[in-house]
Amino acid sequence: MISEKILRHIFQYRRLLSDTEPCAKEPCSICLAPHLPKIQSFIENNEPIHFILPAFPAKSPNPQKVLGPMPDMGERVALQFLQNLCNQISEIYASGAKITICSDGRVFTDLVAITDENVSLYRQGIQRLLNEINADAIDTFCLENVFTGMSFDQMRKTLVKQYAQPIESIQERVNSEDKHRQFFKGIYHLLFDDYLVLYPDKSREQIEVECNLRAYEVIQRSNAWTTLVGQHFPQSLRLSIHPQDYHSNKIGIHMIKTSDQWGTPWHNAPMFNGKEFLLMKRKHIEDIGASLVWHNDHPSHYILSEQVSQALVTLDNKS
């Protein structure tokens, strides 16, 4: 069955909340069930299989994490992976696949200390990268495609008003369901790491309280964006850059090697270790003595000396 062959191919790159259950190695019928009918529908209509991926928002404002506000080699490798994935699917199914990146940076810039100007610059950089790698299977979708004639603040308020759930209902799920609790913790720690650096005059306790509240707001808007995107692309398969439960209706996906389950190009810097690119925090990369590479007047990635690279490869093999 072509649809199952395609799905199992995609599942090779699944990003899961846990990799200890049998489903991590051999997806069961419940793992496949949310996605197979959608793939089969595209096949029956001889159409490209369409995926949506909320991702590529903007770079973290934390200089200890990233190289700056513009896309770098991390984004380039991730976008090339997505294009390659579509190319691989076309070898299984003649009509191939398409991916729409639903850029959510504008959705919560005010919550994560990113300016709208930097969101715009980042998005322009992403489009340049797509052109450079000839990514003909990828297009983009953003808040401006939906709400026209509004300021960015008005767009965000309209999104929340029309699509958001009450914060209280999100808190209830976080308190009662482990998968929601893990997601909350992931968002909280991303915010906390940034706020510690960005607001050095605030106490740790103040930042903990603020990030706790902000994390719920980020999840609220993220869910609202998910609902909006789902209404615009009701038949599409949903990819996610966040780790997912085995039986989720979203497919968490690894686009580039990371040092943890939550790593993304916009919260890390890319480093070439002599074998492959991987994502790590910028400060950690610099602490181990990697050298910075520039491209087109922008910082691109780091490279390790052979000696340090071999040491890291040895450590990776032991872990």
From Swiss-Prot:
GO function terms (MF aspect): lyase activity
Classification via Pfam families: DIT1_PvcA (PF05141)
Record has Ubl conjugation as a keyword: no
Domain of life: Bacteria
InterPro entries: Isocyanide_synthase_DIT1, PvcA
Entry annotated with the keyword Lyase: yes
Keywords, alphabetical: Lyase
EC number: 4.1.99.25
Reactions catalysed according to its record: D-ribulose 5-phosphate + L-tryptophan = (2S)-3-(1H-indol-3-yl)-2-isocyanopropanoate + hydroxyacetone + formaldehyde + phosphate + H2O + H(+)
Name of protein: L-tryptophan isonitrile synthase AmbI1
Taxonomic lineage of the native organism: Bacteria, Bacillati, Cyanobacteriota, Cyanophyceae, Nostocales
